[in-house]
Swiss-Prot record:
Keywords: Cell inner membrane, Cell membrane, Magnesium, Membrane, Transferase, Transmembrane, Transmembrane helix, Ubiquinone biosynthesis. It is found in: Cell inner membrane. CDD domains: PT_UbiA_COQ2. Signal peptide: none annotated. Pathway: Cofactor biosynthesis; ubiquinone biosynthesis. GO terms for biological process: ubiquinone biosynthetic process. Catalyzes the prenylation of para-hydroxybenzoate (PHB) with an all-trans polyprenyl group. Mediates the second step in the final reaction sequence of ubiquinone-8 (UQ-8) biosynthesis, which is the condensation of the polyisoprenoid side chain with PHB, generating the first membrane-bound Q intermediate 3-octaprenyl-4-hydroxybenzoate. Belongs to the UbiA prenyltransferase family. This is 4-hydroxybenzoate octaprenyltransferase. One of its GO terms (molecular function) is 4-hydroxybenzoate polyprenyltransferase activity. The chain crosses the membrane at residues 34-54, 57-77, 108-128, 152-172, 176-196, 221-241, 245-265, 279-299. It comes from Xanthomonas euvesicatoria pv. vesicatoria (strain 85-10).
Length: 301
């Protein structure tokens, strides 16, 4: 404890370079790719819809690499913001910043390097995409601090995670049509829902530590709220399909996604930590099902 009664974080431990690189890899969640996949699928939805088929190869590479870079940077800044909280939460107490294996200054440098590389890639695209990347950086950097001030950080996460959608339309079409904003809205609803599963895992710890989340806001009505979120997501994706004049494959993909979501409710119905976390992870397959539906639908025109 400090003289002011505030618990001190442990100092960064002396590590060999291989060990330190391993801690950096853990810091950016390289060992847990689920977050990158949840960010990748909606970005690919947008690229395939914007291009009405396979997008230009360089654009596809830039956005795919950008997904990993920005998600990794987001994890770093999230851990930096939560470095005082994570040591007290069961799920996060082994993170590199929480254990002292990586210092706060190191984490900020990792964040800056990742964002600079991502921005360098964006600079190879058109001016509108570059301009849209600026609010994207703000969303990614500010999200971790929302949980201290609002019960809706999951909504903000959806805004941050989905910002690649308008950027993808800008890169391919040079504009962001209504279709792009509909897809963005669907992603906000989806991300709010799947991150609420995640928040349900930490709900007891968050209440104890004074953090806020949709899981706490919804309380005993959490499953009802989840149902509403997923229903609104589905309705928005129906509008996407109608506006883009997508064929049977798309509707089949949505049907598969709906069945996958129903399974999530089945396994998480008792609100236990393990099943809620599995429901969160299961959204990878939801995103994949929708992507396959879009890709096959536009390929078959």
């Amino acid at each position: 404890m400090s003289k002011h009664g505030v618990e001190q974080l442990p100092a960064a431990r002396a590590l060999t370079w291989p060990q330190r690189l391993g801690q950096y890899w853990k810091l950016v969640r390289g060992d847990r790719p689920i977050g990158s996949l949840l960010l990748l699928w909606p970005t690919w939805w947008a690229l395939w819809l914007a291009a009405d088929g396979l997008p230009p190869l360089w654009t596809l590479l830039v956005f795919t690499a950008g997904v990993w870079l920005t998600r990794s940077a987001g994890c770093v800044i999230n851990d930096y913001a939560d470095r005082w909280l994570d040591p007290h939460v069961e799920r996060t107490k082994s993170r590199p910043l929480a254990t002292g294996a990586v210092s706060g200054r190191e984490a900020l440098w990792v964040f800056v390097v990742l964002m600079l590389v991502a921005f360098a890639l964006v600079l190879t695209l058109n001016w509108l995409t570059v301009a849209l990347s600026v609010p994207g950086v703000f969303l990614a950097a500010s999200y971790p601090y929302l949980k201290r001030h609002t019960h809706l950080p999951q909504v903000y996460l959806g805004m941050a995670f989905g910002w690649g959608i308008p950027m993808a339309f800008a890169a391919v079409q040079g504009r962001v049509p209504l279709l792009g904003w509909l897809l963005y809205a669907a992603n906000i609803l989806w991300a709010t829902a799947y991150d609420t599963w995640y928040a349900m895992v930490d709900r007891d710890d968050d209440i104890r530590m004074g953090s806020k989340s949709t899981a706490i806001l919804f309380g005993r009505f959490d499953l009802i709220a989840q149902g509403i979120l997923y229903a609104l997501m589905a309705a928005t994706l129906v509008l996407v399909g109608l506006r883009a004049d997508l064929g049977v494959a798309y509707w089949a993909g949505l049907a598969v996604a709906a069945l996958l979501v129903a399974y999530e409710f089945r396994i998480a119905r008792h609100r236990e930590r393990g099943p809620c976390f599995r429901a969160f992870l299961h959204n990878n397959w939801v995103g994949l099902a929708i992507f396959v539906g879009i890709a096959v639908a536009v390929a078959g025109r």
